[in-house]
C-alpha cells in the first residue's frame, strides 16, 4: 500500500481552523483501504497557547484512519523532519496552504527534489485572500517563483476559479487535479417551514473576509421576524466586537446569536432548525459549511465569491452579487414561501449535493491523484 505523508498546521482534535482540518480528515477517511496516510501537525489549535487534549506529543499515534504525530515547536527542525520523512519514505507528500513556513514552505523546500509534492492552496491565492496583508504575500510569492520552488509540484485545486487564480499568480505551466474537498457523511433532513419566522444560519471563522457586517446591516432593513445564528471561532476580536455593536443596534424583530465554536454534532442540530444558510464571504474556495448545509437539505444564499454555481437551476438556493438589494429580495422570497415550495428547495438542496459534491463521485479522482 502506497504511503501518503500530509503536512498541516492543525489537525483534529483541533477545530478552530475549520475547513482545511475537515478536508484532510475526510479525505483520509475516504481512502483507508487505498493508501496508508501519515500526518505531521502541530500540538495546538489555531491561536491557542495550550496543547491539544488527549494527544501524545512527538510520537506517532492512530487517529481515525491516519497515523499522526503532533510535533512541539522544538521538534519542528530540519533534522527531525528529514528523519521522519526518511522513516516513512512516502510515495507522495501533500502540503496544505501556501504561507505556512513550517508546514508548507519548509517541507516543499526540503523534499521537492526527492519526493513527489502535491500542494492544496486552500483558497489562499484568491484575490480576496491576497488582499489581506497583500504586500507581504506578493513579495513572498515573487521570491518563491524566482527560486522555482513550485516547479514540478502537482496542485490539488477544488474548482475552476482556483485554477484561474493559480495561473494568474503562480504560472500557467502547471500540472493539477480539480477535485472538490471531501465532506463528512451527512443525513438528509426533511424540513417544514410553516411559521413566519425565518431562521438563518452562518458557520464560519469570525474574520473580515467573511463580510458578516454586510449581512448584519442588511438585517436592519428586514421587517419580518428573523433569527440569525452565527457559529464559529472568533479569529479577529476587534472585528467581532464591531459585529456585536451592529447586532445590538438592530430592531426588535431581528435576533442575532454568536455561539462560538461548536462540535460537529452540535452544528448539525443547529442546521436542522434553520431555514436558510448564509455566506457573504469575500473569498471562498470551497466552503465546507455550504456543502454540509446542502447535504442536510438546507438551501443556501451565498455570495458570488463562493464557488457553487447553478443553485437556482436545481432549487438549492441562490448565488448572488454582494449587494443588499439582491440578498434582501431573496430573504423576503424565502420568508413568504409556501410550505410546499420550501419543500422543493429542501429536496433540491440534497439533490444538488448528490449530483455535484457527494464524495463517492470523486473517489476515483483522489485515487488517481495519489497513485500517479
Short names for language-model regions:
Residues 336-371:
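A charged, aromatic-enriched C-terminal amphipathic alpha-helix characteristic of glycosyltransferases
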Residues 5-7, 156, 183, 191-210, ...:
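Conserved donor-binding/catalytic core segment of Leloir-type glycosyltransferases
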Residues 42-46, 203, 227-244, 258-261:
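Glycosyltransferase donor-sugar binding loop
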Residues 137-155:
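Membrane-proximal helix-turn-helix segments that form the acceptor-binding/catalytic region
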Residues 299-303:
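Short hydrophobic beta-strand element within catalytic cores of glycosyltransferases
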Residues 282:
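Aromatic "clamp/platform" in nucleotide-sugar-dependent glycosyltransferases that forms part
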Residues 261-262, 269-274:
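Short alpha-helical donor nucleotide-sugar binding micro-motif in glycosyltransferases
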Residues 1-55:
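N-terminal subdomain of nucleotide-sugar transferases
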Amino acid at each position: 500500500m502506497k504511503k501518503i505523508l500530509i503536512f498541516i498546521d492543525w489537525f483534529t482534535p483541533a477545530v478552530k481552523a475549520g475547513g482545511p482540518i475537515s478536508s484532510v480528515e475526510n479525505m483520509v477517511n475516504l481512502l483507508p483501504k487505498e493508501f496508508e496516510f501519515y500526518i505531521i501537525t502541530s500540538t495546538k489549535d489555531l491561536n491557542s497557547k495550550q496543547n491539544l487534549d488527549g494527544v501524545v506529543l512527538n510520537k506517532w499515534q492512530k487517529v481515525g484512519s491516519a497515523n499522526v504525530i503532533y510535533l512541539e515547536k522544538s521538534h519542528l527542525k530540519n533534522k527531525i523532519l528529514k528523519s521522519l520523512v526518511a522513516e516513512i519514505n512516502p510515495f507522495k507528500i501533500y502540503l496544505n496552504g501556501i504561507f505556512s513556513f513550517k508546514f508548507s514552505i519548509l517541507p516543499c523546500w526540503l523534499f521537492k527534489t526527492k519526493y513527489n509534492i502535491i500542494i492544496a492552496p486552500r483558497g489562499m491565492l484568491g484575490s480576496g485572500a491576497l488582499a489581506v496583508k497583500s504586500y507581504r504575500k506578493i513579495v513572498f510569492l515573487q521570491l518563491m517563483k524566482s527560486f522555482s520552488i513550485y516547479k514540478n509540484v502537482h496542485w490539488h485545486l477544488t474548482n475552476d476559479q482556483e485554477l484561474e487564480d493559480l495561473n494568474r499568480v503562480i504560472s500557467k505551466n502547471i500540472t493539477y487535479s480539480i477535485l472538490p474537498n471531501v465532506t463528512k457523511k451527512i443525513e438528509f433532513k426533511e424540513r417544514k417551514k410553516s411559521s413566519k419566522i425565518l431562521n438563518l444560519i452562518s458557520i464560519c471563522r469570525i474574520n473580515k473576509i467573511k463580510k458578516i457586517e454586510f449581512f448584519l446591516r442588511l438585517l436592519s432593513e428586514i421587517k419580518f421576524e428573523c433569527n440569525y445564528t452565527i457559529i464559529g471561532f472568533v479569529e479577529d476580536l476587534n472585528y467581532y466586537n464591531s459585529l456585536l455593536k451592529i447586532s445590538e443596534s438592530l430592531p426588535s424583530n431581528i435576533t442575532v446569536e454568536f455561539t462560538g465554536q461548536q462540535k460537529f454534532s452540535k452544528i448539525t442540530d443547529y442546521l436542522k432548525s434553520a431555514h436558510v444558510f448564509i455566506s457573504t464571504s469575500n473569498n471562498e474556495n470551497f466552503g465546507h459549511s455550504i456543502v454540509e448545509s446542502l447535504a442536510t437539505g438546507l438551501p443556501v444564499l451565498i455570495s458570488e465569491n463562493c464557488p457553487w454555481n447553478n443553485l437556482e437551476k436545481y432549487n438549492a438556493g441562490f448565488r448572488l452579487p454582494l449587494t443588499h438589494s439582491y440578498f434582501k429580495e431573496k430573504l423576503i422570497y424565502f420568508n413568504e414561501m409556501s410550505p410546499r415550495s420550501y419543500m422543493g428547495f429542501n429536496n433540491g438542496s440534497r439533490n444538488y449535493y448528490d449530483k455535484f459534491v457527494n464524495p463517492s463521485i470523486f473517489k476515483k479522482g483522489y485515487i488517481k491523484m495519489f497513485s500517479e
